[in-house]
Amino acid sequence: MTTQLEQAWELAKQRFAAVGIDVEEALRQLDRLPVSMHCWQGDDVSGFENPEGSLTGGIQATGNYPGKARNASELRTDLEQAMRLIPGPKRLNLHAIYLESDTPVSRDQIKPEHFKNWVEWAKANQLGLDFNPSCFSHPLSADGFTLSHADDSIRQFWIDHCKASRRVSAYFGEQLGTPSVMNIWIPDGMKDITVDRLAPRQRLLAALDEVISEKLNPAHHIDAVESKLFGIGAESYTVGSNEFYMGYATSRQTALCLDAGHFHPTEVISDKISAAMLYVPQLLLHVSRPVRWDSDHVVLLDDETQAIASEIVRHDLFDRVHIGLDFFDASINRIAAWVIGTRNMKKALLRALLEPTAELRKLEAAGDYTARLALLEEQKSLPWQAVWEMYCQRHDTPTGSEWLESVRAYEKAILSQRG
């Protein structure tokens, strides 16, 4: 430990102690909050089923930065490089299209065996795994409908895919000793004015009920459902709206997924957390950065990321909220994107843990809104960066922007060699 870092750490401890914060306890609590990194940042959501196929479902990965992962081995190596630069507990979030098989596998036939390499890798790296059925980029999703499709056989295909995905998810949880959160998102919707908005939602409701009909051990698997405002090609109508899934998660007591980019640009999910928690047992968060639409830019340490973290910490939702990331930027180094976004999420959690929440609650209850605002603003100037650097040091990860040197070296040695 450098003398400069030691000095900054000791001063930070004193400054935070003066406002009633135990920084050692804050770091212990931070280690209780894993962040689930999304595998698809590493290859622009290509997957291994049909890597040269086009990305559909109303989502886009823009850019053509060289060096994207072309297979599972490269993707895992890239993830390891990123994870070495991110302090604290982590998980990995997989989509079904990241299966591994020597022969083609229909999505309704995926099995745990197709993900055994991921499980062994997760064990070796002490990671939990999360999962998602992939209801996009497939011939049977080409007309914009999956679980709500009017064709019984196509709808059944997607039901069977989601049912198979749940078994894969339960396999993850059983093997790794930590429950896998499996999130269902579908792109179903219409581009223009829709006359019958009810029938697709009726079909989706029945389909989801069939999907979750098989009882699985909650210690291994958690169901989550995710809404969206619109997608490219589905601007006028989205079957799985916020109201639909809020009602579904409440009535079926599944987890509800809130994606930061899936609402109107003036809405924020930080304001939805406390409301949803009154009705659903658990929340899954997809922390992202929407720029004018669901653009999935890399997460910043901005006001909304901080507000999301603060909601989790202020209301002690550690055991009920699962923190995941969802962004994919193909215009910059993909490993750097992982590192920037994940470190920012963890920084926001640390800053929330360093807040004198008890004192702020007292001021709020007393109606002293002047002091509340004053303290909220003054705490932004407290030396949280020194605490963060100590956290990085203890987890053998770089402090400051030192990690960028490692990314550049990896790019030169590994990424630049890829075609």
From Swiss-Prot:
* Pathway(s) this gene product operates in, as recorded in its UniProt entry: Carbohydrate degradation; L-rhamnose degradation; glycerone phosphate from L-rhamnose: step 1/3
Q: What does this protein do?
A: Catalyzes the interconversion of L-rhamnose and L-rhamnulose.
EC number annotated for this UniProt entry: 5.3.1.14
**Could you tell me where this protein is found in the cell?**
Cytoplasm
Oligomer and partners: Homotetramer.
Task: Quickly give the catalysed reaction.
Answer: L-rhamnopyranose = L-rhamnulose
Short name of any one Pfam family annotated for the protein: RhaA
Q: Which residues form a coiled coil?
A: none
UniProt xrefs under SUPFAM superfamilies:
Xylose isomerase-like
- Which cofactor is recorded for it? Mn(2+)
Q: Which organism is it from?
A: Escherichia coli (strain 55989 / EAEC)
Task: Please list which residues make up the signal peptide.
Answer: none
Name of the protein described by the UniProt record: L-rhamnose isomerase
- UniProt-listed Gene3D superfamilies: Divalent-metal-dependent TIM barrel enzymes
Q: Which domain of life is it from?
A: Bacteria
Q: Mind listing the GO molecular function terms for this protein?
A: L-rhamnose isomerase activity; manganese ion binding
Q: What keywords appear on the UniProt entry?
A: Cytoplasm, Isomerase, Manganese, Metal-binding, Rhamnose metabolism
- Name the family: Belongs to the rhamnose isomerase family.
* One of the record's GO cellular component terms: cytoplasm
- A single GO BP annotation from the record? L-lyxose metabolic process
